[in-house]
């Protein structure tokens, strides 16, 4: 697989789209939120798929994320990404649900845009329907089949 820094792409996408919210709180908040969401996604994936996803990253990012691995939790769903976003932002009472959803959606969609087709297909097989839909992975399967 050709290396691609999907983590940095997700961070940049979140930061550019939600700069007014993130910068008002902390200039490193996009990096923190992205890291927390990445760890959640990796925890949801089987070890082989998570390892392949981590393998696409530069060594520094790989080391940070691979430390968080170690379990495969099939109970993690889309609402967990929303909750993780809210609590990662640091002020649960100030963050609107729509903003948290938009940040989580941006993260998930950006990753699916940046990874190779082979990994998209694996993730489409491994993830529940709602996460697949948020990542546009259902379309990936249909496109590949056509």
Model-predicted segments: where are they?
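General marker for long, soluble alpha-helical cores
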Residues: 1-146
């Amino acid at each position: 697989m050709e290396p691609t820094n999907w983590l940095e792409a997700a961070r940049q996408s979140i930061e550019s789209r939600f700069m007014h919210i993130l910068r008002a709180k902390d200039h490193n908040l996009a990096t923190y939120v992205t890291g927390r969401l990445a760890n959640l996604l990796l925890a949801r994936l089987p070890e082989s798929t998570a390892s392949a996803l981590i393998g696409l990253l530069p060594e520094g990012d790989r080391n940070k994320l691979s430390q968080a691995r170690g379990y495969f939790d099939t109970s993690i769903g889309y609402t967990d990404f929303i909750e993780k976003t809210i609590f990662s932002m640091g002020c649960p009472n100030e963050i609107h649900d729509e903003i948290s959803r938009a940040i989580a959606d941006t993260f998930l969609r950006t990753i699916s845009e940046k990874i190779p087709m082979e990994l998209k297909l694996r993730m489409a097989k491994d993830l529940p329907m709602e996460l697949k839909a948020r990542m546009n992975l259902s379309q990936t399967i249909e496109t590949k089949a056509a």
